[in-house]
């Protein structure tokens, strides 16, 4: 067992952090052949609660968990880490759109980007969960000029998993039957859950699910508004499902993608599909021998092109807003 990874988790005492850490320590992201150090970052008032989480982690006696660092100092948290999972963010409350969070979270992610730039290992990769995650990732990336831009990612896997779940339910099939379910653009209510390119048992989803009205209206709106629906029902935002999607994402970014599938992650655009270079945009991706690449040969009908434009326009607006605030 030669492999070892140091992982920073921000917002470690929060609900997503609590749902994430035990699975992370048990090998569910990096594999059963990789030992883990956890660097846990929290704001000062949450440190006592975080110490309780650390006690529980100790009490699990995970064979793969080597060391834990508990701190409120980003420089300590990101020191020599190979992965930074940026989970902590000001919470989204009922009735709140992600744009309202931009200013609130901007200074947090600018500071964390700088701390990662100055303290992390040379091979660090950054994965942003805290919302609005695309633009929080953009802010962190622009405040870490020494780290290659292709090491920054934001999570749209929760949307992908939600979409897979809904297609499986509607088609009456098991979840593994659904593949190539792509999320395009922003992790927000403008995202485009692209059922046109999804497959169910190897056939186009549109051939298996004949209810076009459901696909065009109910399905898309359910996925776009699922986060808000969970908040309304639960009184708090998605936590366990978000943690699960983060683990899925890290696994997919590290391991070779099966030949008949892809996964969605937001990353730094290089002009693919007409997206502005430098925007953090969700694309269909594959990993081959540790190298992540965007699948570029997908064609969109008029409906898909319009949906891509809507989410791209929103991401441009968010970028312009944080530029005006001096955050990038």
Swiss-Prot record:
Keywords: NAD, Oxidoreductase, Tricarboxylic acid cycle. NAD(+) binds at residues 11-17, 105, 112, 129-131. Its EC number is 1.1.1.37. Gene3D superfamilies: Lactate dehydrogenase/glycoside hydrolase, family 4, C-terminal, NAD(P)-binding Rossmann-like Domain. GO terms for biological process: malate metabolic process; NADH metabolic process; oxaloacetate metabolic process; tricarboxylic acid cycle. CDD domains: MDH_chloroplast-like (cd01338). It comes from the Bacteria. SUPFAM superfamilies: LDH C-terminal domain-like, NAD(P)-binding Rossmann-fold domains. Substrate binds at residues 92, 98, 131, 162. The active site is at residue 187. It is an enzyme of class 1 (oxidoreductase). InterPro entries: L-lactate/malate_DH, Lactate/malate_DH_C, Lactate/malate_DH_N, Lactate_DH/Glyco_Ohase_4_C, Malate_DH_AS, Malate_DH_type2, NAD(P)-bd_dom_sf. Disulfide bonds: none annotated. One of its GO terms (molecular function) is L-malate dehydrogenase (NAD+) activity. It catalyses: (S)-malate + NAD(+) = oxaloacetate + NADH + H(+). Catalyzes the reversible oxidation of malate to oxaloacetate. HAMAP family: Malate_dehydrog_2. Belongs to the LDH/MDH superfamily. MDH type 2 family. This is Malate dehydrogenase.
């Amino acid at each position: 067992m030669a492999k070892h990874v140091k992982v920073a988790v921000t917002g470690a005492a929060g609900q997503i952090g609590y749902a994430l850490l035990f699975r992370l320590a048990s090998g569910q992201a990096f594999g059963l052949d990789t030992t883990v150090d956890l660097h846990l970052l929290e704001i000062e008032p949450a440190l006592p609660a975080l110490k309780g989480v650390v006690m529980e982690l100790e009490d699990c006696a995970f064979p793969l968990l080597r060391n834990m660092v508990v701190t409120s100092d980003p420089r300590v948290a990101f020191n020599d880490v190979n992965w930074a999972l940026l989970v902590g963010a000001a919470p989204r409350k009922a009735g709140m759109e992600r744009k309202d969070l931009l200013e609130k979270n901007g200074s947090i992610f600018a500071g964390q980007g700088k701390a990662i730039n100055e303290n992390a290992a040379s091979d660090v990769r950054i994965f942003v969960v805290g919302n609005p995650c695309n633009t929080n990732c953009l802010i962190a990336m622009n405040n870490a000029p020494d780290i290659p831009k292709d090491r920054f990612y934001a999570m749209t896997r929760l949307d992908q998993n939600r979409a897979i779940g809904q297609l499986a339910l509607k088609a009456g099939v098991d979840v593994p039957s659904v593949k190539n379910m792509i999320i395009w653009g922003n992790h927000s209510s403008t995202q485009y859950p692209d059922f046109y390119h999804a497959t169910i048992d190897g056939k186009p989803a549109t051939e298996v699910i004949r209810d076009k009205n459901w696909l065009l209206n109910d399905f898309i709106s359910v996925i776009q508004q699922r986060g808000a629906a969970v908040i309304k029902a639960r009184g708090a935002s998605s936590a366990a499902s978000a943690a699960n999607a983060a683990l899925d994402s890290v696994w997919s970014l590290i391991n070779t993608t099966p030949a008949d599938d892809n996964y969605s992650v937001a990353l730094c655009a290089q002009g693919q599909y007409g997206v502005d270079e430098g925007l953090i945009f969700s694309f269909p991706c594959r990993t081959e021998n540790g190298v992540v690449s965007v699948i570029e040969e997908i064609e969109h009908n008029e409906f898909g092109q319009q949906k891509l434009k809507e989410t791209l326009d929103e991401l441009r607006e968010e970028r312009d807003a944080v530029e005006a605030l001096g955050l990038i």
